[in-house]
């Protein structure tokens, strides 16, 4: 059977009837003649011509991208969907991506405008001059307190020449006239790499270093100090000036401040293994908790048993973080000692820290969970504060914050501790009040721990305190002579912190701006009297020999003496009197010598000495190094055997404390600042050595170097200066040996020999050298005082004004 193939033109079979084929062709011809009927040769479906008069599709169909039958008033699609059918306008289809991009661009533009406005506002605030009352005198000239020619401006208050008003070192009165110095800063605004600014005030470590930078810059570019041969020689030698300018450019704190970003892994806080906690517990109690008594030994042991037996959910996170912090603090202390003694445990201890710090990151990322008013939160926050300052990439929680994180985190945790303490009512007395320090309840003990930590934070950041003794009904207690030695040391230390509160309020706070010269001098005299009363009260404690079985307490005794020396520096540096300025060099030098004595030989350092050394650098402002460095620059003594060597040794001892894995830690940044100071001293010393070889430096007769050639003081000046505080220290080497860098042959048994007088007390020139001058009677007005105290020579003893506040004295002596 033969298949039929269709005709391509007509689609009819080839063997079809011819008559039918002809009829088909005729129909095709007729259709081709008509333009309205498309040809069947086109395979596409014929389309009708659109009606130009028809309306466009409705908006709903256009949005849904479906065919619209354009029926009025409602198309069939909208009728079935029961939605409004709108033919009013024909909107364009919205590009969602483009719309989001435009919206984001608008937000970015607004943020740029806000950022520019904030930057301009910061500049205006820095340049803005404080308003003056109509009755306030307008000074005619403003001195620069950060770089004046006289040594007094290094550490004293700011005083306009035509006014007697006296200001604190960190707050300056800017003249309203046009000839004022616009470069005088109101504190140091620090820019952070993550954005934002923060004010660091005097005497924060960064503020001290920037103060030295401003002082050197001023002397190199503007004013040469009058009477300073050092800077006159440098100004005359372009090569020397270029060397100092190059060293000045190496200042390490000129850029943005790098604060680590705390990132949590959003996992719950984990409990550390109990065996690691038990291994660390003894070291924590003996070397950390003994100075900062956060926990009672027995109660801490019971808490450990309860937590690991029940793992209660109520306070589980708080105790888990507390135990983690105890391990971190102990492991960090062991790691420092291991590095110094070249032990094989170095890598093991260092490798353990990051894993434990993850728990701290989780806690710091959500700090609010530990702000509920309860004692355990106070304790855990205290342990976290300790770690923040030493390792800033991280007292227990506050202690950890101080060790491993930045200063901003440290201050944040400190403020959280004080807030929880006030919410818990630690500053209020509860129950019967005991007058003995050794019978103090737990709540009161925790209050004093938080109180002392708050005073340390105030001087380390220059910011006001959060807890004040006048706002608390808890007062100092007396500690009996038969109380345990650590309790007596702790009581003396807390007593000194109450004096620190008065020092900050009267000399370093914003309130001190309103004080006149006479008021400021009176405040200095009162605080100096309070320090001498403290010295008299605790002289036996400072001079007590340490038994061999209590050898770990000897560094704590040295720390208490160091605290007393730093306190003297903090007071005397605010006095413009020249004799007072000369006097306070001795406690500054003695403070650095105490650091050297605690550090000793690094290869034989112990856990107790290392813990005390860390507290010396961490808990106290580094004003001694700053002021001795300033004296070297002012007086032209950068190569003096004593001051320059002490600064170099202090930096060497600081290298024991910082970790290479945490370059942004407090100790690491502090070491960088001290390195810049020592490099600057070495540069000046090198310039003077070359100048001495060339014959441009030194006395005309060539008998001695110009650095030590001075006019001897008159007998009246010598009689007004109290005895050298060095005589009160029984350090294991003599003063001459220390100045020459010699090592002692036989260490002394006690830290203070009973034959020496108390700090700051004058002794009689006749008779037994151990009898203070006030005991000799005669014309000494101090005989009428009880307890007797040494009166500074510049203080008129016959003045009708009291030497110190009677109410404050009665409260601290009760």
From Swiss-Prot:
Family annotation (InterPro entries): AtrR-like, Transcription_factor_dom_fun, Zn2-C6_fun-type_DNA-bd_sf, Zn2Cys6_DnaBD
Key words, A-Z: DNA-binding, Metal-binding, Nucleus, Transcription, Transcription regulation, Zinc
Tree of life domain: Eukaryota
Cellular-component GO terms for this entry: nucleus
A GO biological-process term: DNA-templated transcription
Compositional bias of kind Low complexity: 713-723
Subcellular compartments: Nucleus
The UniProt record lists the keyword Endoplasmic reticulum: no
Keyword Ligase: no
Protein's name in the database: Transcription factor oryO
Organism for this UniProt entry: Aspergillus oryzae (strain ATCC 42149 / RIB 40) (Yellow koji mold)
The organism's taxonomic lineage, starting at the top: Eukaryota, Fungi, Dikarya, Ascomycota, Pezizomycotina
Gene (UniProt): oryO
């Amino acid at each position: 059977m033969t298949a039929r193939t269709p005709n391509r033109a007509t689609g009819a079979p080839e063997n079809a009837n011819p008559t039918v084929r002809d009829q088909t062709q005729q129909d095709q011809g007729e259709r081709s003649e008509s333009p309205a009927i498309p040809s069947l040769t086109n395979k596409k479906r014929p389309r009708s011509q659109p009606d130009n008069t028809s309306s466009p599709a409705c908006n709903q169909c256009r949005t849904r991208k479906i065919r619209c039958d354009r029926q009025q008033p409602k198309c069939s699609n909208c009728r079935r969907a029961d939605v409004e059918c709108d033919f009013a306008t024909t909107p364009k289809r919205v590009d969602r991506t483009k719309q989001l991009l435009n919206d984001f661009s608008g937000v970015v533009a607004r943020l740029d405008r806000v950022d520019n406005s904030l930057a301009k506002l910061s500049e205006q605030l820095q340049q803005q001059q404080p308003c003056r009352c109509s009755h306030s005198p307008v000074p005619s000239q403003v001195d620069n307190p950060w770089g004046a020619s006289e040594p007094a401006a290094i550490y004293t208050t700011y005083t306009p020449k035509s006014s007697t008003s006296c200001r604190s070192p960190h707050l300056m009165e800017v003249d309203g006239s046009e000839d004022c110095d616009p470069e005088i800063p109101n504190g140091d605004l620090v820019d952070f790499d993550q954005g934002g600014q923060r004010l660091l005030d005097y005497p924060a470590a960064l503020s001290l270093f920037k103060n030295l930078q401003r002082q050197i810059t001023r002397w190199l570019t503007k004013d040469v100090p009058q009477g300073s041969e050092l800077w006159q020689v440098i100004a005359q030698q372009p090569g020397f000036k270029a060397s100092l300018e190059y060293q000045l450019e190496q200042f390490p704190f000129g850029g943005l401040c790098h604060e680590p970003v705390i990132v949590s892994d959003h996992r719950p806080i984990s409990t550390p293994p109990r065996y690691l906690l038990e291994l660390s517990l003894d070291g924590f109690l003996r070397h950390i908790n003994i100075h900062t008594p956060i926990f009672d030994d027995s109660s801490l042991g019971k808490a450990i048993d309860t937590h690991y037996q029940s793992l209660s959910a109520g306070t589980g996170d708080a105790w888990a973080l507390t135990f983690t912090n105890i391990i971190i603090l102990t492991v960090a202390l062991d790691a420092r000692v291991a590095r110094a003694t070249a032990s094989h445990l170095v890598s093991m201890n260092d490798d353990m820290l990051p894993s434990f710090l993850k728990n701290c990151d989780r806690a710091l990322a959500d700090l609010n969970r530990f702000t509920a008013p309860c004692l355990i939160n106070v304790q855990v926050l205290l342990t976290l504060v300790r770690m923040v300052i030493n390792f800033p990439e991280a007292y227990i929680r506050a202690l950890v914050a101080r060790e491993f994180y930045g200063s901003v985190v440290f201050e944040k945790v400190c403020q959280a501790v004080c807030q929880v303490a006030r919410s818990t009512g630690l500053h209020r007395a509860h129950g019967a009040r005991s007058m003995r320090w050794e019978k103090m309840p737990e709540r009161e003990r925790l209050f004093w721990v938080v109180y002392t930590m708050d005073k340390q934070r105030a001087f380390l950041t220059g910011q006001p305190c959060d807890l004040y003794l006048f706002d608390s009904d808890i007062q100092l207690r007396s500690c009996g002579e038969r109380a345990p030695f650590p309790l007596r040391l702790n009581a003396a230390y807390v007593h000194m912190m109450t004096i620190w509160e008065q020092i900050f309020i009267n000399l370093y706070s914003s309130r001190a701006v309103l004080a006149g010269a006479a008021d400021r001098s009176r405040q200095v005299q009162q605080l100096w009297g309070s320090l001498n009363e403290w010295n008299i009260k605790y002289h036996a404690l400072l001079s007590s020999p340490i038994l061999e079985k209590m050898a770990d307490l000897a560094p704590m005794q040295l720390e208490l003496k160091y605290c007393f020396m730093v306190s003297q520096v903090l007071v005397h540096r605010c006095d413009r009197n020249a004799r007072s300025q000369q006097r306070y060099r001795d406690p500054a030098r003695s403070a650095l010598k105490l650091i050297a004595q605690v550090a000793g030989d690094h290869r034989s350092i112990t856990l107790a000495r290392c813990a005390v050394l860390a507290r010396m650098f961490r808990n106290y402002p580094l004003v001694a190094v700053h002021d001795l460095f300033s004296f070297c620059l002012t007086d032209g003594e950068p190569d003096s055997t004593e001051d320059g060597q002490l600064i170099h040794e202090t930096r060497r001892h600081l290298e024991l404390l910082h970790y290479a894995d945490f370059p942004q830690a407090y100790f690491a940044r502090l070491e960088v600042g001290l390195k810049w100071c020592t490099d600057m001293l070495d540069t000046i010393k090198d310039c003077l050595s070359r100048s001495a070889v060339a014959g441009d430096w030194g006395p005309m007769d060539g008998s001695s170097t110009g650095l030590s050639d001075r006019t001897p003081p008159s007998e009246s000046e010598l009689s007004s200066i109290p005895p050298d505080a060095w005589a009160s220290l029984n350090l294991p080497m003599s003063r001459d040996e220390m100045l020459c860098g010699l090592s002692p042959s036989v260490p002394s048994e006690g830290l203070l020999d009973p034959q020496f007088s108390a700090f700051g007390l004058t002794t009689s020139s006749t008779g037994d050298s151990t009898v203070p001058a006030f005991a000799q009677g005669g014309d000494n007005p101090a005989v009428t005082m009880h307890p007797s105290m040494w009166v500074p020579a510049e203080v008129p003893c016959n003045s009708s004004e009291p030497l110190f506040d009677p109410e404050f004295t009665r409260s601290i002596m009760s």
